[in-house]
C-alpha cells in the first residue's frame, strides 16, 4: 500500500460545467476524508427550496461520497456542518437526525456564509480499516 493519500472519485463539475478543483474523497490509511458537500444536483445546480430539501440532498451527496471508499454513515467518526442561517438550526437538526436514528457521530456546527448559494455544507471523516489484520 502507498503511504500517500489515495484520491477517490472523479472531479465533479459545478454550475455551467465548471470543473471543481478538489477530490470528493481521499483515503489516508484507515481514514477517509470527505470534501464539503452541498445540495448540488447532478446538473451542477443547487437544489431549490429551503433547509429541509437542501439538507436531504446534502446528506445524499455525503452518502454517495462515502460510498466511493466503500463506507456508509455508520463509518463516520466526525462531521462538520456549516449553516448559512442560524435560524435554520432546529429544522436542519431534525432532518439530520433522521439519518442517524441510533445517534450521530461527533459533530461541530457553525454559522458561515457559504461560497455557493447553498444553505448548508457538510464534510466528514470516516474510519474504515483497509484490512482486518
Where are these regions (language model features)?
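N-terminal presequence-like segments and the immediate start of the first folded domain
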Residues: 1-60, 64-77, 83-133
Amino acid at each position: 500500500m502507498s503511504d500517500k493519500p489515495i484520491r477517490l472519485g472523479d472531479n465533479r463539475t459545478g454550475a455551467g460545467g465548471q470543473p471543481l478543483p478538489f477530490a470528493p474523497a481521499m483515503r489516508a490509511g484507515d481514514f477517509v476524508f470527505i470534501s464539503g458537500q452541498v445540495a448540488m444536483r447532478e446538473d451542477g445546480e443547487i437544489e431549490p427550496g429551503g433547509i429541509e430539501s437542501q439538507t436531504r440532498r446534502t446528506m445524499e451527496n455525503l452518502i454517495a461520497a462515502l460510498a466511493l471508499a466503500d463506507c456508509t454513515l455508520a463509518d463516520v467518526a466526525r462531521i462538520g456542518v456549516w449553516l448559512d442561517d442560524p435560524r435554520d438550526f432546529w429544522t436542519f437538526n431534525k432532518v439530520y437526525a433522521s439519518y442517524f436514528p441510533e445517534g450521530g457521530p461527533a459533530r461541530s456546527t457553525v454559522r458561515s456564509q457559504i461560497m455557493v448559494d447553498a444553505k448548508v455544507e457538510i464534510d466528514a471523516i470516516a474510519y474504515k480499516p483497509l484490512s482486518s489484520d
